[in-house]
UniProtKB/Swiss-Prot annotation:
Keywords: Ribonucleoprotein, Ribosomal protein
Originating species: Streptococcus equi subsp. equi (strain 4047)
PANTHER family: 50S RIBOSOMAL PROTEIN L32, LARGE RIBOSOMAL SUBUNIT PROTEIN BL32
Gene Ontology CC, one term: large ribosomal subunit
One Pfam family this sequence matches: Ribosomal_L32p
Bias (Basic residues): 7-20
The protein, known as: Large ribosomal subunit protein bL32
Length: 60
């Protein structure tokens, strides 16, 4: 089994981990429904790029 030859320092470990971060999801305002939604996804009301393509949920 492979084992590191040298101990990884805290600084080296933390420099590597600087790129592990969360990013906020891209959100756009949909003029058709008046809601905010994720880009390139069908809104909760069944609209995509201003066109009705799916039935809305029965919860509305």
């Amino acid at each position: 089994m492979a084992v590191p030859a040298r101990h990884t320092s805290k600084a080296k470990k933390n420099k590597r981990r600087t790129h592990y971060k969360l990013t906020a999801p891209s959100v756009k305002f949909d003029e058709t429904t008046g809601d905010y939604s994720r880009s390139h996804r069908v809104s909760l009301k069944g609209y995509y790029k201003g066109h009705k393509i799916a039935k809305a949920n029965a919860a509305e």
